[in-house]
């Protein structure tokens, strides 16, 4: 299961006076709770790059033993550096071919690393996806579903380049906003 870190510490007593500390404590607590429920499950966090304390939250999740970090709401350019030396897998959230190309090339060039998983969120998912107005009009609610399906295939081609380069399978997860 995947746990969001957005204000994860809201139940902590000191949340309103020491929000960062409360959130960091809660990351470890929530992962421990999840491990009790699913001891053999794959457990991780969805951490938005737009968060003020993104790095601190990633490090807390990694040190707590997260199996995977999924990051979007911007490009997680430094995510490989934050998990270096740990077994935690990394997965960017992309919305189009361009964002997939940019993040995978950046990680390859800067860190000699690629994604362990790629998450695709379509234009109908809402949130922090980085679509331009013309793309929203092209792929949005009134648009033909076929158009974005073609974009998904283009993302898949980009991912395949890095599968070949790193001789590893990189699963693609369609997270939402593709057809609904």
Question: Which positions does each model-derived feature cover?
Answer:
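Active-site entrance/lid segments in N-terminal catalytic domains of soluble metabolic enzymes
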Residues: 1-166
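Glycine-rich beta-strand-to-loop/alpha-helix junction loops that act as flexible
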Residues: 171-179
